[in-house]
């Protein structure tokens, strides 16, 4: 599972909402095709990993894949059956804050049909609407 090795603060502030569109990471930089996010949302490390596994199965040895998102925000949670209060809960899982326009995954070395199939399957594992974009 993806998570940072070290963080400056274990329990970060939670942002009220995700504003605007992605300024960085909005173009296909490494591969030939990319999976672009169309709506703002938190994407968990498990969802990223599930999508990555699907794409890598389609790519096998003939293609190459890049993951362009990383879960660097800790989400805290109180244990079950705990009363309210008593401070902030312990870090539970990690999420990546995804803005519209951000490229999530990139692939190269695959034909268009295989790429479409792989990206469609990966997009089903994610909680956001996405579209396939090409470098050209």
Curated annotation (Swiss-Prot):
GO terms for biological process: translation. GO terms for cellular component: cytosolic large ribosomal subunit. Keywords: Ribonucleoprotein, Ribosomal protein, RNA-binding, rRNA-binding, tRNA-binding. The keyword Acetylation does not apply. PROSITE patterns: RIBOSOMAL_L16_2 (PS00701). One of its GO terms (molecular function) is rRNA binding. InterPro entries: Ribosomal_uL16, Ribosomal_uL16_bact-type, Ribosomal_uL16_CS, Ribosomal_uL16_dom, Ribosomal_uL16_sf. Belongs to the universal ribosomal protein uL16 family. Part of the 50S ribosomal subunit. HAMAP family: Ribosomal_uL16. Binds 23S rRNA and is also seen to make contacts with the A and possibly P site tRNAs. This is Large ribosomal subunit protein uL16. It comes from Elusimicrobium minutum (strain Pei191).
């Amino acid at each position: 599972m993806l998570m940072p090795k070290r963080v400056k603060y274990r329990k970060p502030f939670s942002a009220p909402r995700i504003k605007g569109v992605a300024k960085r990471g909005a173009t296909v930089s490494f591969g030939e095709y990319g999976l672009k996010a169309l709506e703002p949302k938190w994407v968990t490390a498990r969802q990223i990993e599930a999508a990555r596994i699907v794409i890598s199965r389609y790519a096998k040895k003939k293609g190459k894949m890049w993951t362009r998102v990383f879960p660097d925000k800790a989400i805290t949670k109180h244990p079950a059956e705990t009363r309210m209060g008593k401070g902030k809960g312990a870090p539970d899982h990690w999420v990546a804050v995804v803005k519209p326009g951000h490229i999530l995954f990139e692939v190269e070395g695959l034909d268009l049909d295989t790429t479409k199939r792989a990206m469609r399957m990966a997009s089903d594992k994610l909680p956001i609407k996405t579209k396939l974009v090409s470098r050209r």
